[in-house]
Amino acid sequence: MEKQKLSVKNSITDYIEWLAQYGASADGGVTRLLYTKEWMDAQLAVKTEMSSFGLETRFDDVGNVFGRLSGTQSPDEVIVTGSHIDTVINGGKYDGAYGVLAAMLALKQLKETYGAPKKTLEAVSLCEEEGSRFPMTYWGSGNMTGVFSEQDAKEPRDESGVSLQTAMHESGFGKGVFQSAYRTDISAFVELHIEQGKTLEMSGRDLGIVTSIAGQRRYLVTLEGECNHAGTTSMKWRKDPLAASSRIIHELLLRSDELPDELRLTCGKITAEPNVANVIPGRVQFSIDIRHQHQHVLEQFHQDMVALINGICLQKGIRAVIDEYMRIEPVPMDERLKAAAFETALENGFSCEEMVSGAGHDAQMIGRRYPACMLFVPSRGGVSHSPKEYTSARQLEIGVRALTDLLYKLAY
């Protein structure tokens, strides 16, 4: 089928504003937490809009919404595109929502311009990615890929004590045949997303082609020393866990800077007990988050970090407990899909560059099971998870155009 020149017929910015009404806050932010009324209203609105585009729509058993354009030659070979509908508390309008709406608009325009594809296309509005209501992330893509089961919904609870399973049932989901095995019909997944960083804005390029999504490890480090008087305890006799933690964090940041490929290290949470100005703390806890695109780098840094913490604490007479509570492996994006994305960008005259995603995305979960790729558009100031999150209309439209043409290349 001969490819025609496509334009964005429906304003992506209008759709961004439309979806942002569901869970809108007074300062321009959006809060759409899994299985709340705002979330349910948004998913139903998306499903209705997909149907108006002529797509076959359905909910799966956890609340993911699919809009299907069946293929004529290989209907069982499905190319899925989309992102997540949920937000962080008082987040922005674009994170996740942009990828959902772009997927819908791309399928609408392809259908109107070319009719049915050879391979099946599906737009998906994934129910959850952020982990903002329950202490579990990727509930939507994790179910689609068979990583999670209904058993996994029983324990996680929100701040009100409501379990994930209860909230799911109260929203009308989780009562049918639960997706217990991964889908075998998906041949590719494409996710369009805002960058949530400032690399593209600084380089002036239109698109980022993601090469891999960084692996993550998170730790809670507990240091126990000796609580004592701030005025009467000599510096040389102290067993101060806060002083030890300061030295540990400083040394880890220095070491992360020395690596040739950037390792991102964050210590974003720290508590001291009893947290009194004139008392040497007896106990300190702090978090460590490390991210890198190569598994061997993460593993080596982990080993070096454990040795450093134990070494400093041994010198100071402090007991250390290191609890690794999250481990997500790096996921490379599919080479064939990346090449097709680059080709599409060049054909349209869009400037682009390869990027590693330091943030986790649904493509990371899905990319473990199926070929996947991600496209980024610029984020102004690199701001995200905030009401100030913003991407210009031109940049949004470039992303939709690139996605539409890439799907044409893959499915028609």
Curated annotation (Swiss-Prot):
Keyword Phosphoprotein: no
Annotated residues for binding of Zn(2+) 1: 84, 95, 193
Record field: catalytic activity: allantoate + H2O + 2 H(+) = (S)-2-ureidoglycine + NH4(+) + CO2
Residues holding Zn(2+) 2: 95, 130, 385
Primary subcellular site in the record, as a coarse category: cytoplasm
Pathway assignment: Nitrogen metabolism; (S)-allantoin degradation
GO cellular component: cytoplasm
Family label: Belongs to the peptidase M20 family.
Quaternary assembly: Homodimer.
Protein name: Allantoate amidohydrolase
Name of the gene: pucF
